């Protein structure tokens, strides 16, 4: 056997082995490489602001804590689509259970079946492992805001327990900037979305009263929305008139619908 023939045999063997190995190898669950659509919140915020510009009334849905419950989430998306009266959808966080990259991508692909724009807040489970990095890639900043019609929606990261003081959670500077933005744009009402409400386990309750004080600075605060404890609740947590509406986990097969009009708002818990 010549050296050239032997070299060709070895080369063929290596090609076969490498091909077989590629078929057997899978990426690490916490690999942060993302395939498919990214930067979803920013793109959908543009759509929301454009579609609702100048409107005094609109309707939106809230879902939350979809982690693991893919079939129930598909059914919720279908229910919202069938209504034909929803202008946009808010997700209250915890798309993932373990912060695994594929969890975000699976849930993103389900949410993309909506025929209206949606945005997602970050939940405490979304922060596990490399989840917060994947969230930033797929959705964007963990604090963000937008204007729907004449109303400002301020979406906050309140999962302080997962950050160990490495970032300000909640971010009072961001809240102050949003207050300034409302004044600049002459907006007279607003609402807040967060995953964990004050007095829950992952909120920084050392600053809970300070947080509530900040909320009172915002003109025309209508209500706050959150998820996290997997229950359907409406609470005046601080007995000061600010209502916190909690959307249960999607396995309860319930989502919330808010109708905004010039007189105020209506609220409904929809079972599907």
Q: Whereabouts are the PLM-identified features?
A:
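Active-site glycine-centered loops adjacent to acidic/histidine catalytic or metal-binding residues
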Residues: 65, 93-94, 123-124, 195, ...
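N-terminal active-site segment of His-dependent metallophosphoesterases
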Residues: 22-106, 187
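Stable alpha-helical elements in mature extracytoplasmic
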Residues: 56, 69-76, 92, 103, ...
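His/acidic metal-ligating clusters that form di-metal
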Residues: 25, 81-88, 163-243
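Binuclear metal-dependent phosphoesterase catalytic core
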Residues: 25-41, 46-47, 63, 146, ...
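Beta-strand-turn-beta hairpins that frame and shape the catalytic cleft
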Residues: 50-61, 145-155, 182-190, 237-243, ...
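Sec-dependent bacterial lipoprotein signal peptides
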Residues: 1-22
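Core catalytic region of metal-dependent phosphoesterases/phosphodiesterases
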Residues: 73-148
């Amino acid at each position: 056997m010549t050296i050239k023939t032997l070299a060709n045999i070895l080369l063929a063997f290596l090609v076969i082995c490498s091909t077989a190995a590629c078929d057997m190898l899978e990426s690490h669950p916490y690999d942060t490489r993302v395939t498919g659509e990214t930067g979803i919140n920013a793109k959908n915020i543009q759509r929301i602001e454009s579609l609702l510009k100048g409107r005094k009334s609109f309707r939106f849905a809230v879902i939350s804590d979809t982690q693991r419950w893919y079939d129930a989430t598909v059914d919720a998306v279908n229910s919202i689509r069938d209504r034909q009266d929803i202008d946009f959808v808010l997700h209250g966080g915890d798309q993932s259970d373990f912060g695994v990259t594929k969890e975000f991508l699976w849930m993103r692909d389900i949410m993309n079946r909506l025929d209206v724009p949606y945005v997602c807040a970050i939940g405490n489970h979304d922060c596990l492992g490399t989840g917060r990095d994947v969230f930033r890639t797929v959705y964007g900043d963990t604090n963000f805001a937008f204007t729907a019609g004449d109303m400002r929606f301020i979406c906050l990261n309140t999962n302080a327990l997962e950050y160990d003081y490495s970032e300000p959670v909640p971010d009072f500077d961001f809240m102050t900037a949003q207050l300034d933005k409302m004044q600049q744009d002459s907006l007279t009402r607003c609402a807040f979305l967060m995953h964990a409400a004050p007095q829950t386990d992952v909120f920084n309750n050392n600053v809970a009263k300070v947080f509530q004080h900040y909320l009172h600075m915002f003109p025309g605060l209508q209500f706050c929305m959150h998820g996290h404890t997997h229950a359907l609740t409406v609470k005046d947590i601080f007995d000061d008139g600010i209502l916190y509406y909690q959307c249960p986990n999607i396995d309860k097969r319930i989502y919330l619908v808010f109708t905004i009009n010039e007189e105020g708002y209506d609220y409904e818990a929809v079972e599907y």
